[in-house]
C-alpha cells in the first residue's frame, strides 16, 4: 500500500461530504456521542468534542507555519489554536492501540478505540522526547472504511512503522498527559511523549518511501 490517502485537498473536500451523521455512533453496541461518557462537570467533557471531530479540514483551516518540531518543543497549551489543522512530515516509530478512554465511552473493544501513531522527525531521533502522538479515531476510521480505506490499528501498524509519512489533521492539546511529556515535565521518569500537542484526529496519511 504505497499511498494510503492521495490527492490531499481534493479528497479532503470529497470525504467531507461523506462525514455527516457521526455525532452519535455505536461503539460495541453503545450509543456514544461526541462527549463520550465523560461527566459534564469534568474538563474531558469539552475536550472530547475536539477528539471526536469528524469534519475534514478545508484549505483555509490549515496553518502551514506549524511544524513537527514546534509540537515537539511546546509546553504552552495556548501556543497554537486547536481549531486549526496541520500537515506534518515525519518518521513512524510505532503504532499501537489507544487506551480505554471516556471519548470512546470506555469501550474495551479494540475495533472502537483510537490508534496512536508515534511520529518523530526521522529515524535517528526516536526517543520519547521526540515522539508526537497523532491519532486515528473510530469516527474517522468508519468514514475511511466507507471509502474502502482500511485504517484499522493492525493495518496501520503493518504498513506505517519504519516509514516516512505525511499526515494531516486537527491540532489538539491533551492536557491529561502533562506529567508524561518532556515539554511540561522535563525530569519525568515515566515520560513517553514529547509534549501534550497532538494531531487528533488524523484525516490524511500518505507513505513517502
In which residue ranges do the predicted regions lie?
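OB-fold and OB-like single-stranded nucleic-acid-recognition modules
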Residues: 21-209
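Positively charged n-region of N-terminal signal peptides that target proteins for export
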Residues: 1-4
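C-terminal motif of bacterial Sec signal peptides marking the signal peptidase cleavage site
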Residues: 16-17
Amino acid at each position: 500500500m504505497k499511498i494510503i490517502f492521495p490527492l490531499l485537498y481534493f479528497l479532503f473536500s470529497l470525504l467531507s461530504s461523506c462525514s455527516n451523521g457521526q455525532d452519535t455512533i455505536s461503539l460495541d453496541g453503545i450509543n456514544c456521542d461526541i462527549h463520550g461518557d465523560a461527566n459534564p462537570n469534568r474538563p474531558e467533557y469539552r475536550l472530547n468534542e475536539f477528539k471526536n471531530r469528524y469534519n475534514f479540514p478545508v484549505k483555509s483551516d490549515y496553518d502551514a507555519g506549524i511544524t513537527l518540531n514546534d509540537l515537539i518543543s511546546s509546553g504552552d497549551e495556548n501556543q497554537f489554536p486547536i481549531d486549526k489543522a496541520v500537515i506534518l512530515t515525519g518518521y513512524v516509530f510505532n503504532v499501537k492501540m489507544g487506551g480505554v478512554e471516556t471519548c470512546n465511552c470506555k469501550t474495551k473493544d479494540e475495533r472502537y478505540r483510537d490508534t496512536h501513531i508515534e511520529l518523530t522527525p526521522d529515524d535517528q531521533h526516536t526517543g520519547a522526547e521526540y515522539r508526537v502522538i497523532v491519532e486515528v479515531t473510530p469516527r474517522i476510521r468508519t468514514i475511511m472504511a466507507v471509502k474502502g480505506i482500511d485504517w484499522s490499528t493492525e493495518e496501520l501498524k503493518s504498513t506505517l512503522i519504519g516509514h516516512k509519512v505525511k499526515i494531516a489533521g486537527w491540532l489538539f492539546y491533551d492536557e491529561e498527559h502533562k506529567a508524561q511529556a518532556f515539554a511540561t515535565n522535563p525530569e519525568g521518569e515515566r515520560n513517553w511523549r514529547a509534549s501534550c500537542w497532538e494531531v487528533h484526529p488524523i484525516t490524511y496519511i500518505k507513505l513517502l518511501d
